[in-house]
Amino acid sequence: MEYNKKTGKWESPYWHPALTTDAVVFGFDKEDGSLQVLLIKRGKAKPGETPAFEGYWALPGGFIQKDEPTDECVHRELFEESSMRLFNNDKGIQPEFIEQLKTYSARGRDPREFVVTVAYYALVKKDKYIIKGGDDAAEARWIPVDRVGELAFDHSEMLKKALTIINQAIK
């Protein structure tokens, strides 16, 4: 840390990228047996924000808050954007499977700025949840993985990686 005499504050000499989390959430449809993924439709940017993939389907996720661990951020974003609550902080239990998938940091993966994301994947009993879009998600919906089209950002890559891991685990 270095002291900045102009601002009167201690500052890091290192540049810091924006940090986000994204979640690839899978569930089986009991009626047709298909593997489905939870997607959100990105809403319009708020006034003053740079638009990024408005109207595109994406994985639920978003920016980390100050002093927030990534494990908490992914749960908060899932709840804010889809109403899915996988973790109950009051009881300290985690009833569903969720695990880190990979960290993504390619230049240009987000048109707004340099963003590093910690991606997670989860397996849930989807009938336990009533899904609805919230926060900056215009809509939330379960979509069969074989019907997913182009996704925002590099979310198609994340979905593909999570599917590969699941396929390897069940073979």
Where are these regions (language model features)?
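N-terminal strand-loop-strand
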Residues: 2-59, 71
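Unchanged
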Residues: 63-170
